[in-house]
Amino acid sequence: MKSKKQTKLLLILDGWGYSKTTKNNAIALANTSVWDRLNQTFPHSLIHTSGKDVGLPGKQMGNSEVGHLNLGAGRIVKQDFTRIYNELQNGDFFRNPILRNSLEYANDNNKAIHIMGLLSDGGVHSHEEQIHAMLEMTSRQGCKNVYLHIFTDGRDCAQKSAKKYIKKLESKMKELNTGEIVSLIGRYFSMDRDNRWSRIRYAYELIAKGKAKFLAKSALNAIELAYARGETDEFIQSTSIKAPTSIKKGDVLILMNYRADRARQITCAFTDEDFQGFSRGTFVPTQFVCLTEYKKDFNLPVAYPSSKLNNVLGKYLSNLGMTQLRIAETEKYAHVTFFLNGGIEQAFNGEERVLIPSPDVATYDLQPEMSAFELTDALVENIESQKYDLIICNFANTDMVGHSGKLDATIKAVEAVDTCLGIIYKAMFAIGGEMLITADHGNAEQMINPQTNEVHTAHTNNPVPLIFVSNRKADIMKPGKGALSDIAPTLLAMMDIEKPDEMTGNSLLTFK
């Protein structure tokens, strides 16, 4: 009979930030009796999740990919956004061999170039400056027939801000005398990550075949028509600009999103010869270029390949022969697996995974509890098994519902998670385990932009809480002294394991 483990649990409450301001703060306004009791009883602090503290430029807000990379790496991880930003500053971007080769191919073979991606300054999945730079590269290389397929945001930025970004892009096009915006669609359709292929189909048919629900005279007109229909940027339906434009065999497609999770499905639709998501009709092969590595087995040209991270938490524990469980609902499954493991898709030896399906609803404000209770049931069952040295669990609610901008729904999401915390605490207490609770970034603590008084759907730069739940006595680092890169070393300290040299983060706990 196998011995029972002294299980440690890392709970990641996605989007659960901290703000002193209680107005329009879903976390402060919610009934959180369990959370309040944990804060009053156990060592707690605040840690950083944005900007240079997580490998991003300046005051750039954090996000789930960045957060989980830092959580698992135990060091500040230089992000793709930062790598590309730096190369834009020093000019290396325009010398990128993969991008240059794709443009040369188009010129040599008289093929069109299609640039697609999320157009905003949100900086979570993409940045408008990088799309502008790609357009400039086509101009420098004398490319003809350059088409732009725009994904509108409204999630990592204001809900109705698309016009601002379109105007800047059109100004750049005029300056360079190149490029034409031929289609426009909201990210809700083009950037699904939850296998809702019916959404991706709208984006694919728009870009590949020029098949759209609506036709507009210009990109700005497309946005005006969408607003008149009651849509915000995230949900703008497929629209062709001036006349339908389709992709021809051998055309170059460049996807300018750098974050993998919401780029994978649209990439599959354009590149997988055995694609099963929906009927594409006759498959049109293209020269598809990924800005970053969305998935290793795609075997596609990648402008910015991933940098390998050695001795991330999962691999380090695996090498020590320890057991671990990763558990989340669909929306955050990639984060507790692929991203937490430093961009490695395959599970490490001794690592098991449990996926709880996210509810099939149009938007999560319609079901704020999402699958939190099913997730909790599965988590408690695995806690009680005492099979694992470490369990890492993500609750998606406060981020995914927070993105809706609906305060009442987000309060319900917070309260659902709080109820689950009570159940999990009892299970961990019963086995004598220890629990570290934190978040990857803020969101739900700011539902209105205080400067504009508009609905706020994006992440924040606020710190996030950290609570150490244990019968052991410990001092915790003062608020503002730690960051997400310190969490893996802290977990190792809880397990009485020395951290590897690669982990430059520090334990935030001092045991008495």
Swiss-Prot record:
Source organism phylogeny: Bacteria, Pseudomonadati, Pseudomonadota, Gammaproteobacteria, Candidatus Pseudothioglobaceae
A GO cellular-component term linked to this record: cytosol
Pathway noted in the entry: Carbohydrate degradation; glycolysis; pyruvate from D-glyceraldehyde 3-phosphate: step 3/5
A single GO molecular function term of this UniProt record: manganese ion binding
Organism: Vesicomyosocius okutanii subsp. Calyptogena okutanii (strain HA)
Class of the enzyme per the UniProt entry, highest EC level: isomerase
Protein name: 2,3-bisphosphoglycerate-independent phosphoglycerate mutase
Isomerase as UniProt keyword: yes
Active site: 64 (phosphoserine intermediate)
